[in-house]
From Swiss-Prot:
Its EC number is 3.6.5.-. Its cofactor is Mg(2+). Mg(2+) binds at residues 173, 193. The lineage of its organism: Bacteria, Pseudomonadati, Pseudomonadota, Gammaproteobacteria, Enterobacterales. This is GTPase Obg. The gene is obg.
Amino acid sequence: MKFVDEAKILIVAGDGGNGCVSFRREKYIPKGGPDGGDGGDGGDVYMVADENLNTLIDYRFTKSYRAERGENGQSRDCTGKRGQDITINVPVGTRARDLATGEIIADLTVHGQKQMVAKGGFHGLGNTRFKSSVNRAPRQRTMGTPGESREVLLELMLLADVGMLGMPNAGKSTFIRAVSAAKPKVADYPFTTLVPSLGVVRMDSHQSFVVADIPGLIEGAADGAGLGIQFLKHLERCRVLLHLIDIDPIDGSDPVENAKIIISELEKYSDKLAQKPRWLVFNKVDLLDADEAKQKAQAIVEALGWEGDYYMIAAINQEGVKKLCWDIMEFLKVTPREQDIATALAAEEKVDFMWDDYHKEQLENPDLEDDDEDWDEEDDDGVEFIYQR
């Protein structure tokens, strides 16, 4: 199945049903009084994380999702039926962003996590609500409010503990094949990897971590060169980044300049991503003598001004790979995950537009909201609508 990590959709919550103007008409009961019921609330739109999904391709074809409208109120004080909610299933790791405001309205990182993304409209009031000692035959009612409508950008970001970045042909796919059961394509030409892939590294029966492999970066990626930086977002949730450097590039390029290009493109994309813990990993050391490889690695480290530790590996024959993986495992044990925005979104949210406040104001000040054009004192069947401006 094709890997799609972005999609735009329209979500529309249901409108609230209108209130009803009705009077009780029954034999032997003169002046029965008002009995118009309230409308029903509009349906809400929810998103749910589903671990059985791994792509957003379905949302490239179905772009509009609408919840059901609440039914209007009826006579005999019958309340309208509430609109049915709809649920949109998305892969775990999906983030939903409101395109109009840029606000993140959902970030689903756990299977089964559910988040409301569009609130249904509130129901209107029937004329029964407006009866009083001085107004025994009210002809007022309120209309239901519109449901929320949003144009949303869905972004799928892989959930991994470790992210790999580097130039094309730095050996990222070879590394992930060496440490996990993942089998990404490996070949001797650039951009063999076209889509991100995940591999689970099992150190023993109780310890493991997930590695993400993304397509290589080249100079100008931030401006769209190569495959651009569209896949860097998959590294945002990682706790540590492995910067793989080909210690002896077959094309004769300078490893120092290659490393600087990656660092520069990383900073252009996101300061937050550039500040994540990053380890230098020199790959393909088997192509050089041991002493020559050490001298070359040390020269690169000094040229970059690198002050942290670095590793020398040969992913193709797993030289130095085991030690690197155990060091990663120990680092992850003491490095907690960043608190997801989903934690805050999952907390019980307070709706700004409160039902009680909305109707209390209308009931207390019906005369202030009258629309004179809708009222005819000479027409016994006239109905007065109350609008919230």
